[in-house]
Amino acid sequence: MSKTTFDAQSITNSLRAAKHQPRKRFGQNFLHDRSVIREIVESIRLERDDNLIEIGPGMGALTEPLLAEVDAMTVVELDRDLADSLRIRIGANSHPNFEIIKNNAMHVDYRELYSDERGKLRVVGNLPYNISTPILFHLLSYADVIEDMHFMLQKEVVERITADVGSKTYGRLSVIMQYHCHTDYLLTVPRGAFNPPPKVTSAVFRLTPHIIKPVVAEDEEYFALVVRETFNHRRKTLRAIFKKSTLLPTLSEDDFAACAIDPQARPETLSVKDFVNLSNQARKVEG
């Protein structure tokens, strides 16, 4: 692991040297706790030939210890000041296979970073909390070229992504993410591990895209619509939701029976498989 020191003071000094102020619109909170950094890197279990992509490297607190574990690495950084600072500090001279993409993570075509030679992508990052969900959904569209993803987000969002069916935190994000990926909650990160400290506690989690989905929706866009619309009315029964919704068809008792779902059930009691069966039946009714 890199011997570079990252602590609150060194982060502050580096920001001053780069004449950079953390930008709220980019959701910039810089990780500095070395024990947390070590734990994150170890949890990823990297191999030398991994095709590693880091989103939002910031000051490089994770970048350098990650780079010490692999032969090549690409980072995506929107903030040009930080990207330039990384290029100067790490540079192509000491790491010829280190590439910086100055771009919004939402605008990157991740398929271009994949090749048979380089292999599937292993994506990591401390995502900007204010746009984390859109980035996750963008990455899901490249799931076929991604081996796994390790991200740090607000703890409450990670709890929703990894929630078990029937729990209070189980919802739309749980169903959609678990439809596409296996999810693992890895570790909790306290506010003090960052400079400046965020207002919320963070957590690290893993997403591993299914090579073969356990269940397959006949129309994935419609499946997402059913999940979204039902959880928008999570206190109502499924019968009531489908009866009153302007976006979904009314389902009969036979329709619910066809997918082995109780019409009196509420959305949080349905598994991913239940939602797939429900959306397939609703799509059939709608024609």
UniProtKB/Swiss-Prot annotation:
One Pfam short name: RrnaAD
Record has RNA-binding as a keyword: yes
Listed GO CC annotations: cytosol
Domain of life: Bacteria
Leading EC class: transferase
Polar residues: compositionally biased ranges: 1-15
Principal location: cytoplasm
E.C. designation(s): 2.1.1.182
An example molecular function term from Gene Ontology annotations: RNA binding
Binding-site list for S-adenosyl-L-methionine: N29, L31, G56, E77, N126
Keyword terms: Cytoplasm, Methyltransferase, RNA-binding, rRNA processing, S-adenosyl-L-methionine, Transferase
Protein name: Ribosomal RNA small subunit methyltransferase A
Annotated source species: Psychrobacter cryohalolentis (strain ATCC BAA-1226 / DSM 17306 / VKM B-2378 / K5)
